[in-house]
C-alpha cells in the first residue's frame, strides 16, 4: 500500500511519479 494518498483517477499519474523518482 502506498504511503501517499491519491484519487483513483490520479492513480496513473501517481505511478508515473514513482517511476520518475
Swiss-Prot record:
Conversion of fibrinogen to fibrin is triggered by thrombin, which cleaves fibrinopeptides A and B from alpha and beta chains, and thus exposes the N-terminal polymerization sites responsible for the formation of the soft clot. One of its GO terms (cellular component) is extracellular region. Residues 12-21 have a biased composition (Basic and acidic residues). It is found in: Secreted. The modification Sulfotyrosine is found at residue 6. A long coiled coil structure formed by 3 polypeptide chains connects the central nodule to the C-terminal domains (distal nodules). The long C-terminal ends of the alpha chains fold back, contributing a fourth strand to the coiled coil structure. This is Fibrinogen beta chain. The lineage of its organism: Eukaryota, Metazoa, Chordata, Craniata, Vertebrata. The gene is FGB.
Amino acid at each position: 500500500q502506498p504511503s501517499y494518498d491519491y484519487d483513483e483517477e490520479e492513480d496513473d499519474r501517481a505511478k508515473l511519479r514513482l517511476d520518475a523518482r
